[in-house]
Amino acid sequence: MSEPSRDPRMQFLIDRLLPGTVRRVRVTGFDGEDVLVRLLDAVGEEGETARIPRHEASTRSTAHPAELFEVGQEIEAEEIGRWHEDRLLLSARACENPALRSFLLALEPGDVVAGTVAGVHDFGVFVHLDGEPDGLCTGFIRVPDLTWDRIAHPSEVVETGRRITAEVIIAETRSGQVAISLKALREDPLVRFADQVGRTLTGPIVRVVPFGVFVRLAPEVVGFLHLSELAAGETAESPEQLVGEGESIAVEVTEVDPRRHRVRLSAARRAGAP
């Protein structure tokens, strides 16, 4: 199940990283560490001048692209944009491994894929996707795409060796990676929680930050209570002066925003309060 709407910033990035047209080019020289090329037409005649930035030359580590390419050599490269003066930019690394490129191009955003967790790190999770070329690890899950819940570390959700099913966000030919999402296959819990606005709930404080606290209201649902609400007339410079992590607190749900995945809270009114 896909998310009802994607963050516009993420969609902009996805649009920029979608595979471009592959062009046949001839290496004409080097400008610093960039590779200069000319486009070739169907009969091999040279056309527009283009540039392959150093970081788009190869996935292999070399001191200079001259170790990879020779002047006069013909290669394939993917269009990635335009440089100043409208010069065409290309990526040779996107075409470096034909088997990998074929695998990536067969995947579309929204496809459901399966794989095995290869590594769990504080910045995300690497996944061996079924069908990927031997010797590669193409799947990657960012921390925000693991779960709707707030977590301290990805190991709370997955472990190395676990089989998973996830949704493709984008298969990126330049990095050779497939960005995938576990949480996209699950309904946003805030969709069903939206009818709780105005209700008073009690839950444990799961995180304390300088400007307030996060309170667990239901499985995978956490709301934020600002320090000004928490203090309720008391003088406090930080939440730690008033409450601690794990402490239960009564709050009123004032806003549920599924688009931003945000729940705002206020202090629960005492009986008889105006």
What would you call each of these model-derived segments?
Residues M1-P274:
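Single-stranded RNA-binding regions, centering on S1/OB-family and related RNA-binding modules
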